[in-house]
């Protein structure tokens, strides 16, 4: 089965690579329109997936990721339309020169070819990834989680119908609908057909891909994100950022999971934090230095377990640790962070600059929420993933991250001397 999918995707990629920006945008507009026109089919399929997942004991954070509403589906369609409005990087001349021989040399952006994406209970990923791949002239093979099998099947059927109505092969966007996990291992060895693999899921999935894949893998998306509260912070303003970073949508990978508080401001900051977190329904997981003071406040507080510093809660839970100074905070982030998104809240710009220079994450913020790490917020449109590695892309992966380049030499029957 996968062999045939790979052949179809590779053949489709050759046709996609020849499309103009206008032709690709016409396809995307058709997909967006059809997602809205066929919304009832997609939402009914999703309702069945959610019901099964709830019956099987899936946690609330994952159920939130899985669930589609009419508003969310409309937002997904609107995201596709936003991709239409983005500049197409394919064909862009990155740089060029004329050599002494007279050969005119250009480095030009081209599609990667076929992208493979493995993800879990995130039905929006199906459309986000497909739209970005099509915009950049890439075919894509999707493998969603078993929890989203009906939703993904319905969504991909809509996309394929839109492709065919525009004269393009359905093989441009395909989904593996068999939940057999052995197919994941088989997919990881499809280097004959797939040019880049992107896993979007937990640490176990990323480890599996790194160990078994014969295809170049882009890893990331696991967000153990930190905010360091410096001693010079403006408490009221800092709390607004923390509430946003923790509560706006707790199930996302750019949500803060650990708050590092400078010991010199703890006495004034912790009571205010407790009050604010109580109002927001956040459970605080406090270290020994913060526990007693936080327990005196209104927030729900438990003693933090050492392993929780490495946890991506994806829920209304927040670690709180007292640190001696900026060096202590940076050391903690280096040990427990996932190089996703980390922030400092401070009025001391020297400390801010040190934090930016010394915290080696894909996105580092000064006096801002970690929630900004998002393709849409960065002006990239829908993102295919957030990469926490350094090759071939880093941070939110937009259109350029789905391209490579080729060298093109144009001569007049020019020969090398």
UniProtKB/Swiss-Prot annotation:
Keyword Amino-acid biosynthesis: yes
Enzyme class, first EC level, given as a word: oxidoreductase
Major location (coarse): cytoplasm
GO cellular component, one term: cytoplasm
The family this protein is said to belong to: Belongs to the gamma-glutamyl phosphate reductase family.
HAMAP family: ProA
Protein role: Catalyzes the NADPH-dependent reduction of L-glutamate 5-phosphate into L-glutamate 5-semialdehyde and phosphate. The product spontaneously undergoes cyclization to form 1-pyrroline-5-carboxylate.
Protein's name in the database: Gamma-glutamyl phosphate reductase
Organismal lineage: Bacteria, Pseudomonadati, Pseudomonadota, Gammaproteobacteria, Enterobacterales
Record gene name: proA
